[in-house]
């Protein structure tokens, strides 16, 4: 892994196409002035960035474009005319422990970390998650109204968030002004639960409590927006199936969630004229029949739900949901947390799952811990992975392998991109490096260039020919590599 972030060769082709093209047939294109470049037609070009265990974010040359039929067994056929779902974006979760780690650094290093995640030159994250009250990487237990029996939410307050989470979000917005944020609670206020505690337990189902909780959400959206945060969506509960962990949780059944959404939350938002998307999430992916069908199958609730958030191994749930509820937005809201190993193998797994989930109609992807300290541990003792690790004692920044898993997507695939058809030849099946839905995906950005993402999980280099229409080019993917190729003018 790298302990300092390399300065990447600019390969993003949007906004200033010619001035930012890194390679044309493996050679560097020079321009005397931006205005001179803008007058020239865009020449067909390829920009390629690759990451391996020993060399992350390396610019590599592709072979010259050719109009001859491709040769060799490993042909990737791109069909930009066959399109699938739009892509809303990528990001991670804003957590209190992360901001605490960032603030241990001096101003220039703080800026480096935030730029690496949110600036156009970095991961370019535009779609992020935040907890409503304490999550498992908060500094301590808390909610936004801990006054028992305060059904009118008289004592509702986001003052704690104004000191920690909101400054974190606003610092990110300096580098990503269009940052969109969605909120989800791990636990309601403890007095609303059957066990009167943040961990474990279930939501009380009496009408006064449910009505108060709906008001809690409405006040939250309004307060965050007044504080300058673009909170575009809310989800009712993080992992409603779980109630046995040593961190904030709350159990709901699918039927209970539907009742809360239909009879309390949606009417309260309408009454308060709060125009915010309501999603069903965040659901552990294997629980589609138990949680998704009761809500989306309801004639009143279903049409008012903007999307679904799935966590962990989402591919079967994404595909099944798309087939049953076509056109519904879906977001991968969290992947495996692991235990702080931050290994290349885990990064390859995350990269593969991103390809898989997006190939099965997910519209976006949010990672869990963007930043942690060298302890990598929650307030309740759970050590986990992160994209960036900050050594708070030695003031050292480490960009972990999964940082590059995310960046290979988020730096190049822009909001509004569309997934396009990308297929490997059938004779690849069964080889050491098959192009399955876990190893190949492609998009067309709003500015027109094609973005092809390839994974070579094998231990040997893999020659590949990219073909789109009459154009083709050869690349050799390094062993154990993650790759992004940007094709302009094809």
Can you describe what each PLM-predicted range is?
Residues 137-141, 189-196, 240-245, 288-290, ...:
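Short acidic/His/Gly/Ser-rich catalytic and metal-binding motifs that mark active-site loops
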Residues 43-60, 67-74, 78, 181-183, ...:
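Substrate-binding and catalytic surfaces of secreted/luminal carbohydrate-active proteins
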Residues 194-206, 239-253:
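Active-site-proximal beta-alpha loop/turn segments in soluble metabolic enzymes
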Residues 133, 184-186, 236-239, 282-283:
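Short, well-ordered beta-to-alpha junction loops that form the rim of enzyme active sites
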Residues 1, 18, 30-43:
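Bacterial Sec-dependent N-terminal signal peptides
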Residues 94, 132, 238, 311-312, ...:
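Residues that line or immediately flank small-molecule/substrate-binding pockets and catalytic motifs
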Residues 4-23:
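Bacterial N-terminal signal peptides that target proteins for export
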Residues 57-231, 263:
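N-terminal catalytic cores of secreted or lumenal carbohydrate-active enzymes
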């Amino acid at each position: 892994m790298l302990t300092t972030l390399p300065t990447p060769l600019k390969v993003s082709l949007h906004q200033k196409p010619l001035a930012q093209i890194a390679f044309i047939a493996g050679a560097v294109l020079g321009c005397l002035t931006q205005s001179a470049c803008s007058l020239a037609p865009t020449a067909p070009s390829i920009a390629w960035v690759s990451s391996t265990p020993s060399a992350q974010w390396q610019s590599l040359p592709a072979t010259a474009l050719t109009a001859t039929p491709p040769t060799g067994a490993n042909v990737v056929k791109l069909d930009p005319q066959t399109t699938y779902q739009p892509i809303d974006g990528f990001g991670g979760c804003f957590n209190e422990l992360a901001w605490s780690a960032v603030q241990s650094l001096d101003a220039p290093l703080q800026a480096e970390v935030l730029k690496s995640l949110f600036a156009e030159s970095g991961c370019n994250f535009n779609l992020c998650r935040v907890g409503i009250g304490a999550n498992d990487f908060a500094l301590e237990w808390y909610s936004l109204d801990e006054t028992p029996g305060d059904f009118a939410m008289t004592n509702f307050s986001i003052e704690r968030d104004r000191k920690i989470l909101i400054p974190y979000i606003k610092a990110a917005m300096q580098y990503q002004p269009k940052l969109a944020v969605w909120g989800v609670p791990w636990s309601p206020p403890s007095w609303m639960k059957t066990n009167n505690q943040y961990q474990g337990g279930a939501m009380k189902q009496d009408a006064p409590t449910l009505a108060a909780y709906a008001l809690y959400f409405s006040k939250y959206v309004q307060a965050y927006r007044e504080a300058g945060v673009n909170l575009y969506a809310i989800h009712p509960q993080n992992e409603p199936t779980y109630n046995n962990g040593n961190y904030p949780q709350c159990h709901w059944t699918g039927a209970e969630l539907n009742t809360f959404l239909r009879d309390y939350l949606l009417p309260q938002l309408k009454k308060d004229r709060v125009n915010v998307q309501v999603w069903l999430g965040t659901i552990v992916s294997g629980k589609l029949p138990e949680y998704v069908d009761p809500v989306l199958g309801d004639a009143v609730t279903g049409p008012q739900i903007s999307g679904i958030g799935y966590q962990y191994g989402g591919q079967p749930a994404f595909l099944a949901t798309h087939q049953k509820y076509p056109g519904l937005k879906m977001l991968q809201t969290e992947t495996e947390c692991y235990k702080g190993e931050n290994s290349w193998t885990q990064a390859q797994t995350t990269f593969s799952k991103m390809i898989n989930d997006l190939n099965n109609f997910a519209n976006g992807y949010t990672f869990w811990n963007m930043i942690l300290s060298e302890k990598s541990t929650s307030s309740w003792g759970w050590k986990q992975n992160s994209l960036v690790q900050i050594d708070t004692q030695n003031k050292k920044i480490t960009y972990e392998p999964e940082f590059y898993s995310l960046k290979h997507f988020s730096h190049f695939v822009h909001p509004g991109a569309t997934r396009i058809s990308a297929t490997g030849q059938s004779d690849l099946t069964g080889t050491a490096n098959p192009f399955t839905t876990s190893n190949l995906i492609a998009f067309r950005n709003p500015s027109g260039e094609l973005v092809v993402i390839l994974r070579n999980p094998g231990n040997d280099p893999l020659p590949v020919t990219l073909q789109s229409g009459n154009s083709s080019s050869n690349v050799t993917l390094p062993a154990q590599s993650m790759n992004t190729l940007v094709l302009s003018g094809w």
